[in-house]
């Protein structure tokens, strides 16, 4: 069978074609598979769509019952998993859902939820038994056109976990167009003319996708080519639900809890469908359950009218804007609900205008897709908008059953692709891909339009790879650059709209020696499943090294605004490296003299050393690691300068490998453990590197620190040097990846001790780091519960000089799960009112280099690039 699966944000569906049923081989009949699912307690029915919801109850029901039960107990409902797959601010493989349930209630990862939805459909198909196991069929699984490579790979991983290892990915707008071809082409071909441009406007529950397809016609011969794809927009029907929920909460006149808001949102989603689809329905009543012992008696009531829903939908999301009006660049989205980073401007009109201007094409026709456009009034509004912009009304290509169009189109594509019958849309890869060179340039790896199976090679004389150590590449992509060719070096203009992906990394093993340069060719291929495969081929051997995405790491988004990096000549760097060798290899320079001598030869104070120079020094310190054992003084200097040059452990190519090298000395401890200063510098060293370590590595450090900081009941606190204790606390507080419960215990223990001994700057820094609403490097799913931060704010209410701590503990993120309650925020605001910190507290300004340095505990290297 030729199967299409729509893994939707709100609803999923499965359709198939039996080639043996095709009387007309170009347009075979498409069947929709009805999916059995629980619709009420003890009742199972088959439905044409599977709501993309999982309810965390016995058996973890999926679908209609899960969605409806979630409206009653929203903190046990998992939804919008597809939106989370594209959210690089979190670890998408970690158990972070449901987001609003808090750490103890988060039991599934976005990948696991997606796998469960797919496996539910697979189990239903297999149990039906008519056509053999689903895993043996020709399957096409759809993804948003704007999904980047990381999100696509995670989608494939989810399918593999669900038992579907063999499949192809197809972009949802293309699937919608294939559905139109399958169901309408024969009778609508008269509408098609040569040069015609069709806009596919696909707005679902969580994402908006725009694509353009151009028609080529020569008599009866008609071809379609995709010519443009819009960038990823986390904006859809969910945002309208949130807007209606905001309106209802305003009318209720009471601030609701997270649980109440989740239930309200589900009611508003149902109200939206009723009010926008049925003009006879003038209002819908909204009921919000009370909290605590007065769940029923304390319930709240209001209503949403059709007029209100229309005004918000039409004027808020589809306003009749001027053609040249661009999306508004707000500091953060007004609709950042439940952790998802929705776009700041909800006006789909402005995003569509920006896309069409970038594409440089005027649509002659529109094909709508996605649940957002089920109400006819919203489809009409987009047609009005295009007529308003271009002076002509576009032809409307109708797709029946918008909830099923993607699945049926995917099934048609599976059929056409595997049988050679039917019609295929050309267009290939929607992005051009580049390997970054320096800060502002790159070499084109794969051009936009590369077709499935195409192999591209970049063979340049100047391409060499460092062997016998891990290497990392910056991978960039563009949706708008159309003329670049493989191997071309491009200097990107300032403001170029580039997407920076998670880095590509590989371990290059070559020969038995140490580091060496190997001449290579770069290769890439758009695989049959629709993902990008990249590799390096040696020119002097048969070796091939695959480059893999580091999906657990956040991709770098924007450089931190701050000091420009100084430029230091290679001769000066070489002189600085020779000073280090003179000190550690030859003993010609006393270790305590080395910092001043380095500053003198570099002509810069050490806080101004650029990151590239610092990392070259760090590499030499790591090479000379055994030389630290010459004396206690040498170890102190090695730890102090080595850690300083490697701080903060990430943000520069090769840092992961440097951390692995540094970790080799951890288990043995300091070489001169009986010296207090060596122990102090030992913990400073690991605190500086903490951001580059993974969860397990940080756990090793915590395991060694915690007995000294929080002894088990019945054991006395070990007496130690105050400076050593202070640095141990700072290092423990820098471990953002250890369990939240452990970090809560650390903060509580520190506050308890400080109430007896006093609140010094180190205590305040540790508390601010542990309870930060926006972590220095950790993903958003590692932020401590807002109730904990609120409790710590109250504990600091009467303590002087807490402005920085208050900003960290109470900074607004726009995510109600992370933001502290109003009372705690008011305490923090009262401490910073009238100071420059108020903008940071309100979340109105991005964290600049100074703010990040304050969070880290010291200045960061100039030129360092961190995630925004």
Regions found by a protein language model. Name each.
Residues 1-95, 168-171, 175, 219-226, ...:
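Early-domain small/polar-rich strand-loop-helix modules and first-structured segments
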Residues 1-25, 185-226, 377, 516-541:
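Gly/Thr-rich phosphate-binding beta-strand-loop-beta motif of the actin/hexokinase/Hsp70
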Residues 7-9, 33-37, 193, 250-297, ...:
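Acidic, glycine/GT-rich loop-and beta-edge segments that sit at the periphery of enzyme/chaperone cores
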Residues 27-162, 171, 239-285, 289-330, ...:
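Phosphate-binding loop and its immediate beta->loop->alpha context
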Residues 116-131, 179-191, 315-363, 381, ...:
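Phosphate/ATP-binding catalytic cores across multiple sugar-kinase/actin-like superfamilies
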Residues 139-154, 292-293, 340-345, 362-385, ...:
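Glycine-rich phosphate-binding loops at beta-strand->alpha-helix junctions
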Residues 165, 288-359, 421-638, 642-653, ...:
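Acidic low-complexity intrinsically disordered segments
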Residues 169-201, 405-424:
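Conserved phosphate-binding catalytic cores of ATP/NTP-utilizing and phosphoryl-transfer enzymes
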């Amino acid at each position: 069978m030729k199967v299409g699966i729509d893994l939707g944000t709100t609803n999923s569906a499965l359709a198939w074609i039996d080639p043996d049923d095709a009387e007309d081989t170009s347009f075979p009949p498409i069947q929709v598979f009805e999916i059995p699912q629980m619709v009420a307690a003890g009742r199972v029915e088959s439905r044409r769509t599977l709501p993309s919801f999982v309810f965390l109850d016995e058996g973890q029901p999926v679908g209609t019952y899960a969605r409806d039960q979630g409206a009653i107990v929203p903190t046990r409902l998992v939804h919008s998993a597809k939106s989370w797959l594209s959210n690089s601010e979190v670890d998408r493989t970690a158990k972070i859902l449901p987001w609003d349930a808090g750490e103890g209630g988060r039991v599934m990862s976005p990948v696991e939820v997606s796998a469960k939805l797919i496996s539910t459909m697979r189990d239903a198909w297999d149990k039906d038994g008519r056509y053999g196991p689903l895993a043996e069929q020709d399957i096409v699984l759809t993804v948003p056109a704007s999904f980047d490579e990381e999100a696509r790979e995670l989608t494939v991983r989810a399918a593999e976990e669900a038992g579907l290892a063999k499949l192809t990915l197809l972009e949802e707008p293309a699937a919608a167009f294939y559905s139109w071809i399958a169901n309408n082409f024969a009778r609508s071909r008269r509408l098609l003319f040569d040069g015609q441009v069709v806009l596919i406007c696909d707005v679902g529950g969580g994402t908006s996708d725009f694509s353009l397809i151009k028609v080529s016609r020569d008599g009866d011969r008609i071809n379609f080519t995709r010519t443009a794809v819009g960038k990823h927009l986390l904006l859809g029907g969910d945002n309208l639900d949130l807007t209606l929920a905001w309106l209802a909460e305003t009318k209720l006149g009471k601030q609701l809890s997270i649980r109440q808001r989740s239930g309200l949102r589900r009611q508003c989603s149902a109200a939206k469908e009723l009010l926008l689809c049925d003009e006879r329905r003038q209002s819908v009543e909204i009921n919000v359950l009370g909290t605590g012992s007065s769940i029923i008696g304390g319930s709240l009531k209001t209503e949403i009218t059709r007029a209100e829903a229309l005004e918000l939908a039409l004027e808020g999301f589809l306003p009749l804007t001027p053609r040249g009006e661009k999306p508004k660049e707000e500091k953060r989205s007004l609709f950042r609900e439940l952790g998802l980073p929705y776009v700041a401007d909800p006006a789909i009109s402005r995003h569509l205008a920006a896309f069409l201007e970038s594409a440089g094409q005027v649509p002659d026709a529109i094909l709508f897709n996605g649940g957002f456009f089920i109400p006819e009034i919203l489809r009409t509004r987009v047609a009005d908008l295009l007529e308003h912009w271009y002076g002509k009304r576009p032809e409307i290509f109708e797709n029946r059953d918008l909830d099923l169009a993607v699945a049926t189109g995917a099934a048609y594509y599976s059929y056409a692709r595997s049988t050679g019958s039917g019609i295929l849309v050309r267009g290939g890869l929607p992005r051009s891909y580049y390997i970054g060179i320096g800060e502002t340039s790159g070499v084109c790896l794969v051009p936009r339009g590369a077709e499935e199976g195409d192999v591209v090679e970049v063979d340049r004389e100047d391409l060499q790879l460092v062997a016998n150590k891990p290497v990392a590449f910056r991978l960039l992509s563009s949706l708008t650059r159309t003329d670049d060719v493989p191997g071309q070096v491009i200097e990107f203009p300032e403001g170029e709209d580039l997407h920076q992906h998670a880095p590509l990394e590989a371990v290059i093993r070559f020969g038995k020696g140490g580091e060496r340069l190997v001449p290579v060719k770069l290769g890439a291929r758009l695989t049959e499943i629709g993902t990008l495969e990249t590799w390096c081929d040696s020119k002097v051997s048969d070796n091939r090294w695959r480059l893999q995405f580091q999906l657990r790491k956040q991709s770098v988004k924007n450089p931190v605004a701050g000091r420009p990096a100084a430029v230091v000549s290679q001769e000066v760097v070489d002189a600085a490296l020779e000073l280090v060798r003179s000190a550690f290899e030859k003993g010609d320079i006393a270790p305590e003299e080395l910092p001043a001598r380095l500053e003198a030869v570099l002509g810069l104070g050490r806080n101004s050393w650029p990151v590239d120079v610092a990392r070259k020094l760090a590499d030499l310190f790591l090479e000379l690691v055994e030389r630290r054992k010459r004396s206690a003084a040498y170890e102190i200097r090695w730890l102090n300068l080595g850690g300083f040059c490697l701080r903060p452990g990430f943000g520069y190519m090769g840092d992961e490998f440097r951390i692995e090298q540094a970790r080799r000395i951890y288990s043995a401890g300091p070489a001169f453990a009986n010296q207090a200063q060596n122990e102090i510098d030992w913990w400073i060293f690991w605190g500086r590197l903490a951001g580059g370590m993974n969860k397990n590595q940080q756990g090793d450090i915590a395991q060694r620190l915690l007995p000294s900081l929080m002894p088990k009941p019945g054991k006395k606190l070990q007496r130690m040097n105050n400076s050593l204790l202070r640095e141990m606390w700072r290092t423990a507080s820098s471990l953002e990846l250890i369990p939240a419960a452990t970090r809560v215990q650390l903060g509580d223990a520190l506050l308890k001790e400080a109430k007896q001994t006093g609140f010094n700057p180190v205590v305040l820094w540790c508390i601010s780091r542990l309870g930060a609403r926006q972590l220095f490097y950790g993903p958003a799913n590692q932020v401590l519960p807002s109730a904990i931060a609120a409790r710590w704010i109250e504990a600091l209410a009467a303590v002087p000089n807490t402005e920085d701590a208050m900003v960290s503990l109470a900074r607004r993120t726009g995510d109600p799960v992370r933001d502290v309650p109003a009372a705690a925020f008011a305490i923090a605001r009262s401490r910073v009112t009238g100071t420059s910190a108020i903008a940071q507290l309100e979340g109105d300004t991005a964290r600049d280099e100074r703010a990040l340095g304050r969070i880290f505990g010291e200045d960061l290297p100039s030129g360092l690039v961190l995630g925004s």
